[in-house]
Amino acid sequence: MKRPSDRTGPRTLAHGAVLGLAGVLLMAGPPGPLRAAPATAAWEPDLEAEPHRYFQRTPRDRFSRLIPDLAEGRLPLDRSSERALVRSLLRALDIPESSQLLVFSNTSLQLSLIHPGNPRALYFSDELYLGHVPGGKIEVATLDPDLGAVFYLFDLPREGSRVSVERARRCMNCHANEDTMEVPGLSVKSVAPGPEGGSLDTFRAGLSGHAVPLSERLGGWYVTGTGGFDGHWGNRMGRLFQGELGATPLEPGRRFSLDRYPVATSDFLAHLLHEHQVGGVNRLVRAQYRWREVRHRHGGSLPLAWPADLEAELAELVGYLLFAGEVPLPAGGVAGDPAFREAFARNRREVEGRSLKDLDLRTRLMRHRCSYLVHTPFFDGLDPALRHRILGDLDRALADASEATTGATTGATPSTHATKAVGLGTRNAASRHLGGDEAATIRRILKATVPGYPGGAT
């Protein structure tokens, strides 16, 4: 398949699309080469073997603890309609319905039910993900500190029936491969969906996170709240036109009734934050698996020196948590659905009125660029030595950013503590994009809100 490329046409449309014969949009390619994937080693775990035993371990995530209540009908669920049941299930799991994302490409387990007229809905919180396609089953992905992403499948609870929750093995075909960094993780597909089903092209394969160019995202998804920005692949059906890959527009709600869903949005901001979470989760899960495997090879002890490729991955992880490489938001910024913004901020941990969940939305996602994932039970449950290492590396990177800026102002030389941070050179690669004031604010927030952070909370 020939990828979209810059080409001319009779009439130029916004963001590089051109109108060809028959009204087909011929999509221009991204403005530059796709960003390279993280520098991960050619490593993948044997999930069945020691020390991982993915399917043999008992999960200790939040959803697994709720399964008995769900199975026995003790959760307060409204069974009057499919929509009402999904809404009440979201409330019971504390997942905001305003996080709804609609995907119409048949790139998931229940693909036979998914099409532009019956999109699958995805909902998410900081640690729990729920999927539902009308007429189908409920899918749940939850984050376990030892196992990574764990997947469950069950039929919609009916009046008087017992719910049977299945731990889904089939999900691992797509959730433990290149797209998830070879570990049990989360996947965000972006494809050019074909009019007869299937995909005509796939974008950003093997990549996840806030560094993926917007022009490679959202293929096969409905998107609302873009403010007119269309430099992405959302709201489009792929077409082949004279051997070239093009697209025709798809307006959300045109081929189906949004009344069938809890809300009428598939908000652009929710898509952006979901992308950040997926990239962070996959990197943290990979670090946990690699760390555990190295310790296992050393009889449970920490080695004197870690493999160089693992050190490189940990450095990249710390940079990711500090939003290194984040692509800029569209000109004019992003507004975000008010209901989603309110729901996103409801569990913010603030210090002096500032929080890691404070949104910027002018040129970047967050005002204080350190991932709020460090406040999740999933992060707290990582191997204690790994968590200690990540927090120490974060602190050194932030100290470097703060002191380097101070040194530039006063002529002072950054301290030894700062220059020994993760990354080489006079500025830490993980934090060189941060200004000194921002880095200092982030350190204050982390010290006050993250147990075990150097010099902070215990």
Label each region the model flagged.
Residues 111, 336-371, 375:
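Charged, low-complexity intrinsically disordered segments
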Residues 321-329, 344-351:
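Alpha-helix capping/termination and helix-coil
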Residues 37-110, 117-123, 127, 139, ...:
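Conserved small-residue
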